[in-house]
Amino acid sequence: MGRAILPTTYSRADAIFNISRTPLVIEALRSGDLDLLRKVMDDKIHQPYRLELISAGVKAYQVAKEFGAVALSGAGPSLICFVEPEKAIAAMTSIMAAIEEQGFVARGLITKPSMLGTHTI
């Protein structure tokens, strides 16, 4: 369903908007620059469409934006929020509350980035 809602074509401006941010996202993740990440995580290719599929998504997205850089992740109804470690619990709790206030069950997970790259666990 996540991919089915996407348009079959996009404007040149929207494609350029997304593509031009790719190196900045990589640099923000590499350097840990959360201010830069907050600025470059907006998207015009799939977020506006997929957010509609997540019943509590718009509210959760708004709450998450208060804590850090947010983007829809994958083809399913998941949100990812990059925040400073000291804000992680508050961000997760607030996002889950926003989802649960709309009558849905929410599950949160706090992780840390791995510098190992792809590997077998």
Features from the language model and the residues they span:
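Glycine-rich, charge-dense phosphate/pyrophosphate-binding loop(s)
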Residues: 18-19, 29-121
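Anionic-ligand binding region
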Residues: 1-28
